[in-house]
């Protein structure tokens, strides 16, 4: 269980020596292998057949995440994720997990800004067991005060370990809090400690009652399945679930940013660190052409995909001023995300030196076209990564669930290969010039004065 740190989870760039031509001919998914249905109660169902092994993964995705929370009530989605493992009247705490384990399977859950998801991966003959348990807790969760009081302390400790005691965690949190003045992406997924201190079991119960329903969920099942038998099982266990009235989500638009935002943090005993984010569009942004999102993905690859990427080559290998340098971008988000760049300086190297080199790298991307060789190499790596990770049924389910929940149309997956392949050097330069600019930028530096 846990919340998702976007810059790590959304890094799909893995290097492979695969012919670009070969990769371009591979579609991420074939429509013949996918069935999509919507039950009468509003539950969306996606089935994907993969018979290479007698295994299945069953996911349920709820369109509810930290972006739906309000000031003073942050962390509810993540806290509810924890409480979902405490059991129902029919299946008290622990029975679900114990059963899945005995059947040779595994289970877990994750929360993001846009969604909360639960999954089980197990031998395909036991799919019905997973559906039986998962459907039960969609509407029958028991939230006990004693369970909540114990679990909220676990969550607070998780926050201390992952955020409050980590340079990167604090910087990442402050980046979003400062970059977004009004957007619902302002608050951390795990919640502010002040809000966790005041959270109650009633807050959890109300959140559950308001959002956990078939008409706010997508069931994704991938693996060694028969479509007809599987859809009947889904109907059997979810078909009788009653929909609820879902509160209309009001998009909170960002006001114009007049210049670069800079945040400097001092943390005693911690190493220096810098992270910057630029406000960029997602595929849900109707004010831009979709090619910009694919060009931004390629741009991220140019910066950090492999040992020959700009950040690795210049900061880590040539200048030897950083031990780690990365970038990240996801076009698959409900609201406009951040294009991220983060660097761990070598001990003794000033952050100002890192900033100067980053400025040179970004300026070059704005003023010069990337070479055809570099562009094709990056495209090959991005696409090869997608093809490689398609071997995992869990990865396939995650992509389907994420896109269905955040964007709405899974056909985007089929178009991904062609859209990445179509990106030009001119388009990469154009998005760099348009988005990697000061009035879209927020920079957070940890211990910048340390030498």
Feature roles, as predicted:
Residues 74-88:
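Active-site SXXK
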Residues 86-90, 138-146, 370-371:
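Short, polar/flexible loop-turn hinges at active-site or ligand-entry regions and domain interfaces
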Residues 132-136, 233-237, 354-359:
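Short amphipathic alpha-helices in soluble, non-transmembrane regions
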